Amino acid sequence: MKEDYKIKFIRGATTASGNSIEEIEDAVVELIDELISRNSLSKSNLLSITFTATKDLDACFPASIARKCHGLDLVAFLDCQQMYVPNDVDFCIRIMAQVLLPSNNSVKHPYLRGASKLRTDRC
């Protein structure tokens, strides 16, 4: 019997150590690695990923890093600036990924580094 699949959404976030290409790359690679490993994803499961970054991160586009470092050429990516809120987490990169998973699979949302305080229930 063929398994039913559904489109599911996975949220997550991390923080970069600073506003350099290398620091952003390090954070994005770790976040995508965790997204994939925690949810047992393959490239074919990933449909799209939207990145947001706080206004203090402008050295590069997180999506270009994810596309390059993970060979995700067929995934739709979008970068946006996160809405500014005073006292928000600095150097924060958030994601929302659309994935195709078996209906009965639950998702695991990776909240890493300084972003773990955003969702203590999911860390």
Regions found by a protein language model. Give the residues of each.
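Terminal domain-initiation and capping elements
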Residues: 1-123
